[in-house]
Amino acid sequence: MQIDKKCYAGHVAPFVVWVGVIFLLQGLEWAGLCPRALYPWSYAAKTVICAGLFVWLKPWRIYPALKVSNVPLALLAGVVVAVVWIVPEMPWLGRVAPGVQEFYHRWCIMMPGAYPSYYNPSFYPALPSGHVSLSYAPQEAGWGLTIMKLIGSACVIAVVEEFFFRGFFYRWLRSAKFWTVRLASFDMQAFWIVVAVFGLEHDRWLAGMFAGVVYGWLTVRTGDIWAAALAHGLTNLLLAVYVIASGQYGFW
């Protein structure tokens, strides 16, 4: 029973706390009680808390270490997902194929049928004045909180999500004692359920599903949870660097 509790807690608790903070902010925003400064500060706080939970609960104890032979494939997967995530929203695509970019923003980002709040085709990629995503920019939050956003995205939530979705959820759909299911064993139904849930967890649901396919395939292909975490972390790192360099804080 003790092993069961530790396995569940280590895989689930950090993710639940992370998502819980998101829902809390949404509730405060709906009630008009969420000052702009709370967004970057809450992100920094949940980064520290969830990293601490992960280290304390040690869910990695039931997995072997990252295999060096899996690193090249993981890095390639991370780059591919980053490219697919970023390119549809790059300014040059709006100049070359504005209809394609408008379609992507209208139908491939939550909620389908309406433009996301950060997108206005008349002055994109600039954000609407005072948009909440700008609260993460160093000009407003300071470099410390902007870097914490990068660290949390690339080093904390990427790992937490992989341990939850690929380490726990994918196998739990097949057995309550999920740790007894081999990561490398493929189950079609479980795979696509995880892809769908993972995609819908993100506002960019189509890119999220593509990422779910790639990270899920990598996990099954290698049987290595750390390969998926490395790929996911690299994707988020590349995205964060692009956001800061380009000023497209709508991604955040």
What are these regions (language model features)?
Residues 1-5:
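Short, Lys/Arg-rich, polar N-terminal cytosolic tail immediately upstream
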Residues 7-83, 99-107:
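Alpha-helical transmembrane segments in multi-pass membrane proteins
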Residues 21-24, 87-104, 201-210, 214:
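Alpha-helical transmembrane segments and their membrane-interface junctions
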Residues 30-31, 58-63, 90, 94, ...:
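Transmembrane helix-loop junctions in multipass membrane proteins, especially transporters and channels
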Residues 63-157, 171-183, 249:
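Juxtamembrane helix-loop-helix connectors linking adjacent transmembrane helices
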Residues 84, 132-252:
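Transmembrane helix-loop-helix hairpins at the membrane interface
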